[in-house]
Amino acid sequence: MAAAAAAAAEQQSSNGPVKKSMREKAVERRSVNKEHNSNFKAGYIPIDEDRLHKTGLRGRKGNLAICVIILLFILAVINLIITLVIWAVIRIGPNGCDSMEFHESGLLRFKQVSDMGVIHPLYKSTVGGRRNENLVITGNNQPIVFQQGTTKLSVENNKTSITSDIGMQFFDPRTQNILFSTDYETHEFHLPSGVKSLNVQKASTERITSNATSDLNIKVDGRAIVRGNEGVFIMGKTIEFHMGGNMELKAENSIILNGSVMVSTTRLPSSSSGDQLGSGDWVRYKLCMCADGTLFKVQVTSQNMGCQISDNPCGNTH
């Protein structure tokens, strides 16, 4: 091939250009293209893509990553809403918080009207107002309740109630003088000045007295029970019992009425004179009194029956 090319070159140079056949031109063109393609693909090595190392999150890991991103986005939106609500309620501005102040001493001061549900002060904390200003606490159609342990103070529209299992005391904060106390062993129970009546469901005490210039009135809407472990002693200049129903006196030994005793019989039930003693289910008694004021009853078994019975408590004097 080299010799033929050299001979052709010598012939072309001596006799002028030599015409090539169609086959020779095609072979020459193919060789040129092959050489060109080999130069273009120099350093290129074809590799199968399936054999390459795959990077990134694919399959289940990709789905899990998408779920985590969505969850973080939801939490970010909730955090943004809470931040906006806190900012709107507390009113944080360029000059700080417009609704409250925090002091180094631990004092939290509210500078405007605040709407709260339940307040839990810390141990030995104090809730109060500013100097020379009133502390106004208002409940929206609900009672205001102050509670510590079992002690509770409830302020309502028409009443104020205090409930305590250990007692209570009211004292002047300036003079520290006790105005009212339920510690009966140390202080005698007195109604505060200006209080005219005391409404209780049950009271346990040694004695109940009134002032020397006023009467002691005990009034009940239903039934009143006065009971003493060692007897009941009622003393006064004048003792009056007014009842709309029945009055029942019970004693283990005797009932003693000292002084002048008057019983109004106008409202006492009585049977008509024409009724027979044995008719019906009624059992009749006659009220009798001894000279010393002792009352006793005698069952009526016959007409015109008196109090002279053999076992009367008066002895020989009726």
From Swiss-Prot:
One of its GO terms (biological process) is gene expression. It is a single-pass type II membrane protein. It comes from the Eukaryota. Residues 1-32 are annotated as: Disordered. Glycans are attached at residues 158, 211, 258. It is found in: Cell membrane, Sarcolemma; Cytoplasm, Cytoskeleton. Residues 87-318 are extracellular. Disulfide bonds join 288-314, 290-307. Highest expression in heart and skeletal muscle. Low expression in brain, kidney, placenta, pancreas and lung. High expression in fetal brain. Also found in fetal lung, kidney and liver. The chain crosses the membrane at residues 66-86. Pfam families: Sarcoglycan_1. Residues 21-32 have a biased composition (Basic and acidic residues). The keyword Disulfide bond applies. The keyword Disulfide bond applies. Cross-link to form 2 major subcomplexes: one consisting of SGCB, SGCD and SGCG and the other consisting of SGCB and SGCD. The association between SGCB and SGCG is particularly strong while SGCA is loosely associated with the other sarcoglycans. Component of the sarcoglycan complex, a subcomplex of the dystrophin-glycoprotein complex which forms a link between the F-actin cytoskeleton and the extracellular matrix. It is linked to Muscular dystrophy, limb-girdle, autosomal recessive 4: An autosomal recessive degenerative myopathy characterized by pelvic and shoulder muscle wasting, onset usually in childhood and variable progression rate. Belongs to the sarcoglycan beta/delta/gamma/zeta family. This is Beta-sarcoglycan. It comes from Homo sapiens (Human). The lineage of its organism: Eukaryota, Metazoa, Chordata, Craniata, Vertebrata.
